[in-house]
Swiss-Prot record:
This is Periplasmic nitrate reductase. [4Fe-4S] cluster binds at C42, C45, C49, C77. The lineage of its organism: Bacteria, Pseudomonadati, Campylobacterota, Epsilonproteobacteria, Campylobacterales. One of its GO terms (biological process) is Mo-molybdopterin cofactor biosynthetic process. Its EC number is 1.9.6.1. Residues 1-30 form the signal peptide. Predicted to be exported by the Tat system. The position of the signal peptide cleavage has not been experimentally proven. GO terms for cellular component: membrane; nitrate reductase complex; periplasmic space. Mo-bis(molybdopterin guanine dinucleotide) binds at residues 79, 147, 172, 176, 209-216, 417, 421, 527, 552-553, 575, 602, 814-823, 898, 915. Its cofactor is [4Fe-4S] cluster; Mo-bis(molybdopterin guanine dinucleotide). SMART domains: Molybdop_Fe4S4. It is an enzyme of class 1 (oxidoreductase).
Length: 924
């Protein structure tokens, strides 16, 4: 057996043993004669594994890794092997459910009763129009998803922004990737990684920062393990985390740091380079391709800026007060000393509204900012394990810096939620690029800072499609008039249709519901009431306020339980779709089986709802706020050949171009397409009649229209048919060729086009006009271009707004486990995965357990200023926190940990920090 086969078999077996189960032989590739196999994509994380799925008698009967898939090469993790079983849980939603009273009328306090699709859409239309007519375009909201198919996300975006003229659509990817997006946009001027997974096999060094890859990206971790075992002496692995986890098992160095101090560690590495190893700097790379930059530090923490908000409990207020002002301790005052502050000073957050503003600084200013981050200071601030000596911790920091600095050593830095879910998440993303740029180790085979995506299409749908409240497809934004013009032309809607004011980000949609500013919300492909911090507020907002909540889901999760209307959604292999993964690889699949019960795809739900709105209801004059009124575009629409009585379905989704897509396309031969042709279930549609399909290839139309946004400016995608013939392609796809390393003129068509005589070109055009300044502020208003250059940011170390205290002495971090996906809505229905990990545990150190008089398995209360939950203690498990920190995963609705967490965010990205709040632990 060769090494790779050994790794593969060991990974499968270890994944199964972790879950406490044996892998069925059918899931390891045994093939039945009457099974029909086809390629598809795994439903779970952002790795983007290819799978083969088998269908028989109208059901998915087996899945296995796809040997032809370049991402996973035939291997799946334990969740991947159970893709089939997620679809057939006993409580699968099969009919719409509406809260009603005994008279059959909608009643917010009523019980759920089954209704027809027509009755469901009638009530949904009524409640939407009530909120829309009362509050306008800001009165409604859509909780979107990084698990939408690309076509679903595109349809939702188009309906919201071109149809309803609202920007209040935001994906749960705001919770997972928004800080990475800001890091990319601020640094490169364009989103998504420069490298690819091939870097793993080419690098000498893998350094993980807040990324427990062994459990969260296990297939990529198998490739890392393979690389490590291929050259034990040369290849080094370092795991940086706030607690010990399985990623440390093959690590040469494990660094346990105090929450938030990753900011200080990055600056220490940069200081080592600049002050002690200037010869390691790639001065030509820096001079030719980079500028130095910074921004304001006094930007708050993304909390409400009114601690006296009527919905706050008294216990919450002392934390929320820090949104406006903090008192500096010695450590934070040292890091901010360039601002002229000292310990004990009140530090006011004066620049909350311009958190993303940045300007160019000199190298000398950059060097000045790094001055405090000596080894002594950084070790004292960052050491996270009380059992480790300061000297040992210092040695590890030095070894870490040396690995980066070593001249010919290739280095890849990976990170995920430990970086992104962070009140300074955008900053710490920028810091990773800072170090790689200083050394010239970015956008090169085997070297680069690489943000790993959490969800299967957080890149492909949330980011590339632009289902964020401020975005449009292909990195365009609603605030840019040129971008709106491009979008309106592609969508064939009148000029000035699109609302130029960004909408509410995900968490703010919740706050708007609580404040009565939004009275209609539609949840699609996610579970916001379980996945949003400080959940007690949002449960009350859903159940006690005058609003109407619609949840499209496949199982009754917490969000469905607090909803007013539940719509049963088709699951992944019951529809056509596409996902985009973390290495920019786009992959498509075909519908394999019919949906269960009366479930229908989210695309169908979006299009059917669009039928209920005439242009005159939505394209009329609309007041956004006291400063902005959207003009009526009905006359312009008439000039384009539309009638004011046309529906949004007619104009946006069933137009002449759409109808040209042949429903009998050769690519679809032999496969169902419920949206296009209906199916044998004879579903009674939203009009009460049998739904027989749209009569045109709607998924192909949506894809081909969507790809127009990216063609010609670095976001090129291939045509629909091509993706069904390959195992994905990494964009930009130019002349049929994918791109492995962006910005490198040897590999990237657009880099070569931008700078034909150079080796690199950072050609993104976002925020490439800068003013000059120093570490404190910009010094002039005159802007200059930094075309084709990237930014090396200085960002200071700052602490979390809520930290352990005498009353709440523990840090709380949340996250995932290998066996379950997100809120557990799907994986908790798989018997094998449920038996393996039936509940979320509170992982804590044995020393803390002894101090509290706890035994293994005891039930405890985990309580913060916001709420409390019961959980069972695990002091001997896979995760080993240091003294003073506990880890509780969030997949278990019976351990509703987001009742405890703090809704603080990165002020730039608006991404919640789920990794840091203060709690007390006591026996239940």
């Amino acid at each position: 057996m060769n090494r790779r086969d050994f790794i593969k078999n060991t990974a499968i077996a270890s994944a199964a043993s972790v879950a406490g189960l044996s892998v069925p032989s059918s899931m390891l590739g045994a093939q039945e004669e009457d099974w029909k196999w086809d390629k598809a994509v795994c439903r779970f994380c952002g790795t983007g594994c290819g799978i083969m799925i088998a269908r028989k008698d109208g059901k998915i009967v087996a899945t296995k890794g796809d040997p032809a898939a370049p991402v996973n090469r035939g291997l799946n993790c334990i969740k991947g092997y159970f893709n089939a079983k997620i679809m057939y849980g006993e409580d699968r939603l099969v009919m719409p459910l509406l809260r009603m009273n005994e008279k059959g009328e909608f009643d917010k306090k009523g019980k759920f009763q089954q209704v027809s699709w027509q009755r469901a859409f009638d009530e949904m239309e009524k409640q939407f129009k009530k909120a829309y007519n009362e509050l306008g375009v800001t009165g409604i909201g859509i909780f979107g998803s990084g698990q939408y198919t690309i076509q679903e996300g595109y349809a939702a975006l188009k309906l919201a922004k071109a149809g309803f003229r609202t920007n209040n659509i935001d994906p749960n990817a705001r919770h997972c990737m928004a800080s990475a997006v800001v890091g990319f946009m601020q640094t490169f001027g364009v989103d998504e990684p420069s490298g690819c997974y091939d870097d793993i096999e080419l690098t000498d060094t893998i350094i993980t920062w807040g990324a427990n890859m062994a459990e969260m990206h296990p297939i990529l971790w198998s490739r890392v393990s393979d690389r490590k075992l291929s050259n034990l002496d040369k290849v080094k692995v370092v795991n940086l985390s706030t607690f010990s986890n399985r990623t440390s098992n093959i690590a040469d160095i494990e660094i346990i740091f105090k929450p938030n101090t990753d900011l200080a560690i990055w600056n220490y590495i940069a200081r080592e380079i600049v002050y002690n190893h200037p010869e390691a700097m790639d001065m030509k790379f820096i001079k030719d391709h980079c500028v130095f930059a910074t921004g304001y530090a006094d930007i708050g923490y993304g909390m409400r800026n009114n601690p006296n908000h009527p919905k706050f409990k008294e216990s919450e207020k002392d934390t929320v007060e820090k949104e406006n002002v903090i008192t500096l301790d010695d450590e934070e005052a040292t890091s901010l000393s360039y601002l002229g502050v000292k310990a004990g000073d009140k530090f006011e957050m004066k620049h909350q509204g311009v958190a993303d503003k940045n300007w160019e600084i000199s190298f000398d200013e950059f060097k000045k900012g790094l001055a405090p981050y000596t080894l002594e200071y950084t070790a004292r601030v960052a050491k996270g394990d009380d059992n480790e000596s300061l000297e040992d911790f210092k040695k590890k920091l030095q070894e870490l810096a040396n690995l980066y600095i070593e001249k010919n050593r290739k280095v890849v830095s990976f990170w995920t939620m430990g970086f992104n879910q962070h009140t300074r998440g955008s900053w710490v993303n920028e810091q990773a690029y800072m170090v790689h740029f200083l050394l010239g180790k970015q956008a090169k085979p085997g070297s680069g800072a690489f943000s790993l995506t959490g969800q299967p299409s957080a890149c492909g749908t949330a980011r590339e499609v632009g289902t964020f409240s401020h975005r449009l497809p292909a990195d365009m934004v609603v605030a840019n008039p040129k971008h709106r013009e491009i979008s309106e032309k592609i969508w064939k809607v009148p000029a000035k249709t699109i609302n130029p004011k960004p909408g509410s980000p995900y968490l703010n949609i919740m706050r708007d519901l609580e404040d009565g500013k939004i009275k209609f919300a539609w949840v699609q492909v996610n579970n916001p009431w379980q996945n949003t911090a400080n959940a007690n507020h949002w449960i009350a907002a859903a159940r006690e306020m005058d609003n109407f909540i619609v949840v499209s889901d496949c199982y009754p999760g917490i969000s469905a339980k607090v909803a007013d209307l539940i719509l049963p959604s088709a699951m992944i292999y019951e529809k056509w779709g596409a996902y985009g993964n973390a290495e920019r690889r786009t992959q498509h699949w075909k519908q394999q089986v019919l949906p269960v019960g009366a479930a229908m795809s989210d695309t169908w739900q979006i299009l059917e709802f669009a039928k209920r709105f005439k242009l005159k209801e939505v394209w009329k004059e609309q007041k956004v706020d006291n400063k902005l009124t959207l003009p009526s575009v009905l006359e312009e629409a008439k000039a384009m050949g539309y009638s004011e009585d046309d529906t949004l379905f007619d104009v946006l989704f069933a137009n002449k171009e759409a109808k040209s897509f042949n429903p009998n396309d050769a690519i679809a031969k032999g496969f169902d397409n419920t949206d296009v042709k209906g199916d044998e279930r004879k579903i009674q549609g939203s009009d009460g009649k049998e739904f027989t399909g749209y009569g045109f290839f709607v998924q192909k139309y949506l894809w081909e229209e969507y790809r127009k946004f990216g063609l010609g400016h670095g976001h090129d995608l291939a045509d629909f048919d091509t993706y069904h013939k390959v195992r994905g392609l990494r964009w930009p796809v130019v002349n049929g060729k994918e791109t492995q390393w962006r910005f490198n003129t040897k590999f990237d068509y657009y880099a070569k086009k931008a700078a034909p005589n150079s080796d690199f070109a950072f050609y993104g055009d976002f925020n490439k006009m800068l003013t000059n300044g120093d570490l404190i502020a910009p010094k002039d208003e005159k802007e200059h271009s930094i075309k084709n250059k990237a930014k090396i940011f200085f960002r200071p170390f700052m602490k979390a707004p809520e930290r352990p205290s005498k009353e709440y002495p523990f840090w709380l971090a949340t996250g995932r486990v290998l066996e379950h996906w997100h809120s557990g809505t799907m994986t908790m229905r798989v018997p094998e995965l449920y038996r393996a990990v039936p509940e979320a545990l509170c992982y804590m150190s044995e020393k803390d357990g002894e101090k509290l008089g706890l035994n293994q398995g005891d039930l405890v209360w985990v309580e913060s200023r916001r709420g409390k939950v019961k959980a069972r203690v695990d002091m001997r498990g896979r995760n080993k926190p240091p003294v003073g920190l506990v880890y509780v995963p969030w997949f278990d609705e019976n351990v509703y940990i987001n009742k405890v967490t703090l809704d603080a965010t990165c002020p730039l990205s608006k991404q919640t920090d789920f990794k840091k709040c203060a709690v007390k632990i006591y026996k239940a």
